């Protein structure tokens, strides 16, 4: 019988896997801190190391299962959460090619550029997505275009960190609406990009 639920949270400072019973009681938790590395070429950058951080995330899952001695077959569902506005870019084959944490601050010039291009755009995007430029993906994607054109040209898909966790667990890259809207690219009313 499936008597447990698992949550995997990709937070700003750490990743954790938490196991609950069906009444919501916490049965076990495993957590690992991760770091976001500044690229010395780009002050304010906070790169996300998806290879190493996947080792940490999957290690949390293994650890909580080992500590609680719960058979994975007894888990009814897994949910993921994350730091909002941390983004990953993928190539056409679904490979991660670039990622940054939500605290990445390298796109200040791009925010200014967007405001110069269209002073009303931020308000228009806010009305549709509920997001401003502050931590939004649009200035970061523009930053990649301006500073890493080879990565920009290879980019076929974008996702947030909990989407990445789901992708790593299932092989399916999908974005759920509440997180997709944090990109500033999803209209919450129409659920269209």
PLM regions with names:
Residues 104:
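Carbohydrate-associated surface elements
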Residues 38-41, 109-114, 185-188:
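Short, charged, surface-exposed secondary-structure boundary motifs
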Residues 10-12, 23, 99, 124-193:
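Gly/Ser/Thr-rich active-site cleft segment
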Residues 107, 115, 125:
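Gly/Ser-rich phosphate-binding catalytic loop and adjacent alpha/beta segment
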Residues 54-58, 62, 108, 112, ...:
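Generic alpha-helical structural signal
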Residues 1-99, 154:
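N-terminal glycine/serine-rich phosphate-binding loop of ATP-dependent small-molecule kinases
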Residues 92-95, 113, 117-119:
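Hydrophobic or amphipathic alpha-helical targeting/insertion segments
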